[in-house]
Every structure is written in C-alpha cells, then in structure tokens.
Curated annotation (Swiss-Prot):
Pfam families membership: GARS_A, GARS_C, GARS_N
Protein name according to UniProt: Phosphoribosylamine--glycine ligase
Alphabetized UniProt keyword annotations: ATP-binding, Ligase, Magnesium, Manganese, Metal-binding, Nucleotide-binding, Purine biosynthesis
Cofactor list: Mg(2+); Mn(2+)
Length: 423
C-alpha cells in the first residue's frame, strides 16, 4: 500500500522511515520532506503543501492513509478537509487541535475537566498582565497563546524577565498573532517527561515514554528551543507515575473532548512536570508526536506502525498492542549556527554516511543541491540516534555517530540523557 506523511522535519523522517519498514507498504510519500527522506529506501518526496493539492494527489495515487507530522497543518484544518473529501487521515480536527494551538483553550479545558495543571490567567492587556505578575512574583511562566514553533514559552526567573516577555508579546508583537494573548501561569518545579499516546476517539494506546531537553545549552541553560535531544524510555515515569498520568490526565482529556462533541483522534502528547511526590501536572498539550522524541521512540518500536495507525483510524485501537525494544534510545539534535533566533542556512554537511554506520541519522532542516551535497536548511538540522542496552551505551553510540558529522557553526548539547544516567 501507499501512504503519505505530511511535514519536513526529523519527526516526519522517523515516522515515514518506520512506516516504510512494514512489508505491506510499497511507498511512503513525504510532503514536502527533506534531504534525508529523499534518499531513504521506499520514501519519496513530493513538493506539495496546499490541502487541495494533497487531496488530489491522494486520490490519484490511491493513498491508503495520511499521517500528519507538524502542528501547523492540523491547526489549519487539514484533517477536516481530508475527511470531507472522504480520505483517511490520522490527526485531530481543527477544533480538537486547539488543545495545542491555543494555550488559553487548553487551560480552560483542563480547568473544566479537573486535569492537574498550574494555576493561570489569560491577558490581552499589557498593563493588567504586568500588575498580575507583580502580585504573583517570580519565578513565573509567560506563554504566547498561539503556535510559536516551541519557542513561545518564557520561564521568567525574575520579574524583569517576566515584564520583558509581556512587552515582547503584547506590545512589540514579537510573536505576531500567536502572542496577541498571553497565558501567565505559576512556575512548577520537578522533572519533565513527554507522555505520548495514540487516540482513536475512545481508546488510547500509549507510546514509549521519553524525556526532551528544551534548553539550548548544557545544564538546561540558554534559550528555549523546539528540543535539543531526547531519550526513551524515561526512568522518571515510574509505573506509578505512568498510571497517574493515564488516569488523571490522558483519559480525562479524551473523555472531555468526547463530551465537548469533538472526539480526539491522532497523537496526543502531554508534556508532564512530575513533582517530588510523583504527582504529574500538565505543562502543555501537543496534538502530534514530539520532535525530537519521535526519533528515539520510533527507533525502539518493534510493532508495524502502519497496523497501529490503521487501527486508530478505524476506531479499533483496543484491538492492537505496541511492542517495544528493551533497549534505550538516545537522540541528539545538531543545530545550525545562531539557532534558535536566526539560524544560518546553506552550509555543506559532511560525514553522514560514516555516522549512519554507527547510529541512525534523521534529517530535519536539510536540502540537497544539484551536485548531491546535503546542505543545512533550518534551525534544527539533524537528530542522531544511538541504541544501547542501557542509557550510557545509547548515549555513547549517539555521540560516537555525531562526531563523524560536521558543518560550519554546528552546535549541540553534550549532556543529553545525563539525568537518566545520574538517577
């Protein structure tokens, strides 16, 4: 069968790569894809992004189903458009995707359904926001209401930082429409984890646990990014935390969306903060697989992903199970110079073949020129995954592979997965 994956990042490379491993799959088209999906066996890039063009392509090629990678097409209603055209697609509707595309919608939803999260208020007026911050004190968290590519969250450790973030979003319009409203919430302490599940509207199939590294620099310093590395499984998600996250967060969310008259289908990602007592709180929802978490998680999935997605689209997730490798996977992101602000593009990347002999290199911000050179073409350029019998082995494999790669201005963290090693 022929499938379609929408997106051009490392997450989409990993999803398409995993789907293509199924003996039932002939070709996975990736729209628009990158330099990695262009050369991966059984994958083929197509240069289409408009919903109607993609719908016509699916009809012409008899695509069995489509998987949506990134958040922007979901927020733009691609699932609604495909379903209206009678095509099978895995992802949430535009309404359900508001769990990610509007922080205010998500927080109000959590309040209504008693899903544990930080206390918050929403503001459009800068003066009122400044007053609230002065009253609450720091540390405090300022979030753009809309989609900001994972960079719309400022964890302000001082009041000055909080006031500056409010001014950037509400007065200086630095986030555009995404920051025209801000959610200000209490700072939660603990350890973060990514809890990702597949949902068919009623049934839930958990994916492997993982932990992301959001900050640019070692020791969780520097600017927030889309994610600089991840590992799976995440030891902080103990069996007790796992049960609590399912029962207190995931299942009430799925039931709540159904009660609202908008069943949630697709990947649901709860960003968790786990406090010292083991209580999980929801920091954010994403309505798609995480990036870079997808890369290590897919590296551990032994099941046929196409079977799982088909079951989910057909409302039969309760009839399948996901089998995971007992190994640990560590993924390290290689980012361009000046990421996350003004990443440099167009530099030649060398050493990819040598790195792929040691680990698995997933492409994100890459493109190829006429000569076949792979060039940097985005902020996060590559994610290198290593597998091992324990976290230390997997980390060594990932960094061993990564050391073969070079491009001008390449930056990466050297401490990915250390939290798990040091536990």
């Amino acid at each position: 069968m022929k499938l379609l994956v929408i997106g051009n990042g490392g997450r989409e490379h990993a999803l398409a790569w995993k789907l293509a491993q199924s003996p039932k799959v002939e070709t996975v088209f990736v729209a628009p894809g990158n330099a990695g999906t262009a050369i991966e066996p059984k994958l083929q890039n197509i240069d289409l992004t408009a919903h109607q063009d993609l719908i016509e392509f699916c009809r012409k090629e008899n695509i069995v189903f489509t998987v949506v990678g990134p958040e922007a097409p979901l927020a733009a209603g691609i699932v609604d458009d495909f379903r209206a055209a009678g095509l099978k697609i895995f992802g949430p509707t535009q309404y359900a995707a508001q769990l990610e595309s509007s922080k205010d919608f998500a927080k109000a939803f959590m309040a209504k359904y008693n899903i544990p999260t930080a206390q918050y208020q929403t503001f459009e007026n800068a003066d009122a926001a400044h007053d609230y911050v002065n009253q609450k004190g720091a540390p405090i968290v300022i979030k753009a209401d809309g989609l900001a590519a994972g960079k719309g969250v400022i964890v302000a450790m001082t009041l000055d930082e909080a006031h500056a973030a409010i001014d950037d979003m509400l007065l200086d319009n630095k986030m555009g429409n995404a920051g025209a409203r801000v959610v200000i919430e209490d700072f939660l302490q603990g350890e973060e984890a990514s809890f990702i599940v597949m949902v068919d509207g009623n049934n839930v199939l958990p994916m492997a646990t993982s932990q992301d590294h959001k900050r640019l620099l070692d020791g969780d310093k520097g600017l927030n990014t889309g994610g600089m590395g991840a590992y799976s499984p995440a030891p902080v998600v103990t069996p007790v935390v796992y049960e609590r996250a399912m029962n207190e967060i995931i299942l009430p969310t799925v039931a709540g969306m159904k009660a609202e008259g908008h069943e949630f289908t697709g990947f649901l990602y709860a960003g968790l903060m786990i406090d010292q007592s083991g209580a999980p709180y929801t920091i954010e929802f994403n309505c798609r697989f995480g990036d870079p978490e997808t890369q290590p998680i897919m590296s551990r999935l032994n099941s046929d992903l196409s079977d799982l997605v088909e079951a989910a689209i057909d409302g039969k997730l309760d009839s399948v199970t996901a089998e995971w490798s007992p190994q640990t996977a560590v993924g390290v992101v290689l980012a361009a110079q000046n990421y996350p602000e003004t990443p440099k593009k167009g530099d030649i990347i060398s050493g990819l073949d040598a790195a792929n002999q040691i680990g698995k290199v997933f492409h994100a911000g890459t493109t190829a020129n006429e000569k076949g050179d792979v060039l940097t073409n985005g902020g996060r350029v590559l994610c290198v995954v290593g597998l091992g019998d324990n976290v230390a082995q997997a980390k060594a494999k990932a960094y061993g592979a990564l050391e073969k790669i070079s491009f001008d201005g390449m930056q990466y963290r050297k401490d990915i997965a250390d939290k798990a090693i040091n536990r």
